[in-house]
Amino acid sequence: MGHQNIWYSHPRKYGQGSRSCRACSNRHGLIRKYGLNICRQCFREYANDIGFKKLD
């Protein structure tokens, strides 16, 4: 096993390591509700485009 094969060689089928943001591929702060699968930073950026409205 070379150096390239060691990292990320374990299968990721479930859990936090298996899911990533659809916009930036980040794995932290993921919003999965309603099937968004987008991290919270990208959600703040794209919320209006998706259709979320900020209420006063």
Swiss-Prot record:
Pfam families from the UniProt entry: Ribosomal_S14
Location(s), subcellular: Cytoplasm, Cytosol; Cytoplasm; Rough endoplasmic reticulum
Cofactor mode of binding and number, as noted: Binds 1 zinc ion per subunit.
Record-linked Gene3D superfamilies: 30s Ribosomal Protein S14, Chain N (4.10.830.10)
Essential cofactor(s): Zn(2+)
Chain sites annotated for binding Zn(2+): C21, C24, C39, C42
GO CC annotations, alphabetized: cytosolic small ribosomal subunit; ribosome; rough endoplasmic reticulum
Keywords noted in UniProt: Cytoplasm, Endoplasmic reticulum, Metal-binding, Ribonucleoprotein, Ribosomal protein, Zinc
Family recorded in the similarity comment: Belongs to the universal ribosomal protein uS14 family.
Protein name per its UniProtKB record: Small ribosomal subunit protein uS14
